[in-house]
Amino acid sequence: MAIRTLLLSWLVRLMSSTWRVRWTDQGPLEEALKTGPVIFACLHGDLLLVAGTHRAWSPTVMVSLSQDGSLLAGVLGHLGYGVLRGGSSKGGAAVLRGAVRQVEEGRSLLITVDGPRGPAGEPKAGALSLSRLSGAPVFWVRGRAERCWRAGSWDSFVVPWFFSRVHMQCGRLAGTADEDGEERRQRLARVLA
């Protein structure tokens, strides 16, 4: 597994170095990062796009305890990301405590809000709960690659081709951490759609 994660991380690093990335609305994120950590929220299918374009901000990534999660954790570790293992179905309370600790220590977090099992595009409450407990703002992130391969998996995982144009967009989730969780979760689903 160690050789496989090393090779995959090398491939991701090589591929993402050839992408022609264009950001929209990045200013508010950069301002927020000057004042403290943020919670990045993306869809599971966009994880490679986000991981390939967020290394400069080096967030800790929440990764499930599954076997696929072990492979992903190894790849992300080789790419220089911190990794926090656990998820909504296994280790949820412990990973939430660990995530709050990461934010208190000044580290931003990256959460795939519809993972690890879906349904695709339907955010769970984890990122919003973490925002409420830690006080860190939620920034949604989405991407689109002009040329890519989409996996036949539940999340239609996106793998941009070498030299693809990648369009990234992010924004602060409107509202406050104290407002109704369901309303905020639906707002997150709309901006990530």
Can you name each region flagged by the protein language model?
Residues 10-37, 43-49:
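A short, well-structured juxtamembrane/interface segment
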Residues 1, 26-27, 35, 66, ...:
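Short, structured coil/loop segments at alpha-helix boundaries
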Residues 35-90, 134, 149-151:
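Catalytic core of membrane glycerolipid acyltransferases/transacylases, capturing the structured
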Residues 1-18, 30, 55-57, 78, ...:
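Non-catalytic C-terminal accessory region of glycerolipid acyltransferases
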Residues 24-26, 64, 86-89, 171-173:
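Conserved beta-strand termini and adjacent loop/short-helix elements that scaffold enzyme active sites
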